[in-house]
């Protein structure tokens, strides 16, 4: 039996992006599908195009499958519906129409993925307008592994790993032709589990009140480096900063399972809430905010008695802390004896 497999989209015509990036992840899954199908004696052709525009991307994959005279076409995707979603959305498959061989493959694939991962089963849906389904000359199935923005889905996907998903898709195909899969069941993705644990170790000290752009520079003329969601926790860096409306920070990049490189965020109180862990005490008038931990430092600003701030660290007799100035949050040095930690 001849099967054509492709990963959806490419890095010039990218797919969905949420907590994970569709194009990055479907590349992992489709390769795992191919590996398991070959191990089970199927003749497999990788019909994933290289980087190109979306129309070329779709046509090249379908043309390769048709020229191969494949008996089955499978395209791997990840879905997206919302900007952010905490609950489960699930796994599903698409076919051109019901009642044919494609539906049998699609049903077995989605059932096997759901049973093997606990992802919600969305079943088989039809869409005769999708290019991959209406231009192929063999039974064709689009697999939507899970939703990129669903925290529940992504947590499950990360725990189970792309190798298991690929195995389960191959198992569903085998079941459709009354064949028992002979590949070994992959173990839980220990690497991704470790990365998720690292996410739990990522120390934060601020909350985005609204969705924020991670910026490559502290200005309104910037490159958007990703997405910080409303209510997402981030880390304001322990660096002196007197820039109006901006602070250096990092955030957790779910698609890469790691802390981001330093970026800039809007520091206005209307969009950002920095934690507090200390109180200004015993100050009669004002406590100077300084650029350096020295009595000779120029003054950046000031805080008053009983004001709250976030202390990053204390060195000798000075505390580096983020405080709320009139324009937004800033970070400066303060004389530590006038600051009481919680």
Swiss-Prot record:
Keyword field contains Transferase: no
Entry GO CC: outer membrane-bounded periplasmic space
Highest rank taxon of the organism: Bacteria
One annotated GO biological process: peptidoglycan catabolic process
KW Transmembrane (keyword) present: no
InterPro entries, per the entry: MurNAc-LAA_cat, N-acetylmuramoyl_amidase_3
Family the UniProt entry places it in: To C.perfringens CPE1502.
Protein name as catalogued: Uncharacterized 38.4 kDa protein
Organism of origin: Clostridium perfringens
């Amino acid at each position: 039996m001849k099967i054509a497999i492709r990963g959806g989209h490419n890095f010039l015509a990218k797919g969905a992006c949420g907590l994970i990036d569709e194009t990055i992840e479907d590349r992992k899954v489709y390769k795992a599908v191919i590996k398991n199908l070959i191990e089970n004696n199927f003749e497999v052709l990788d019909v994933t195009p290289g980087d190109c525009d979306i129309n070329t991307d779709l046509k090249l994959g379908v043309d390769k499958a048709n020229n191969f005279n494949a008996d089955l076409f499978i395209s791997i995707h990840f879905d997206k519906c919302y900007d952010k979603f905490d609950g489960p959305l699930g796994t599903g498959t698409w076919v051109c129409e019901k009642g044919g061989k494609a539906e049998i493959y699609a049903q077995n694939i989605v059932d096997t993925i759901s049973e093997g991962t606990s992802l919600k089963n969305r079943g088989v849906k039809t869409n005769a307008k999708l290019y991959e389904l209406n231009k192929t000359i063999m039974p064709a199935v689009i697999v939507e592994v899970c939703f990129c923005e669903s925290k529940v889905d992504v947590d499950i996907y990360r725990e189970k790993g792309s190798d298991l998903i690929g195995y389960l898709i191959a198992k569903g195909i085998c079941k459709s032709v009354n064949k028992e899969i002979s590949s070994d069941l992959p173990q839980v993705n220990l690497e991704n589990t470790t990365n998720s644990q690292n996410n739990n170790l990522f120390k934060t000290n601020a909350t985005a009140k609204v969705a924020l752009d991670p910026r490559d520079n502290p200005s309104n003329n910037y490159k958007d480096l990703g997405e910080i969601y409303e209510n997402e926790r981030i880390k304001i860096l322990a660096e002196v900063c007197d820039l109006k409306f901006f602070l250096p920070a990092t955030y957790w990049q779910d698609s890469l399972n790691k802390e981001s490189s330093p970026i800039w965020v809007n520091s206005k109180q209307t969009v950002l809430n920095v934690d507090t862990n200390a109180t200004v005490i015993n100050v009669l008038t004002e406590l100077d905010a300084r650029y350096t931990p020295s009595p000779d430092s120029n003054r950046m600003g000031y805080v008053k008695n009983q004001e709250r701030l976030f202390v990053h660290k204390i060195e000798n007799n000075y505390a580096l802390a983020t405080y709320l100035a009139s324009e937004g949050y800033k970070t400066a040095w303060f004389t530590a004896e006038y600051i009481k930690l919680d």
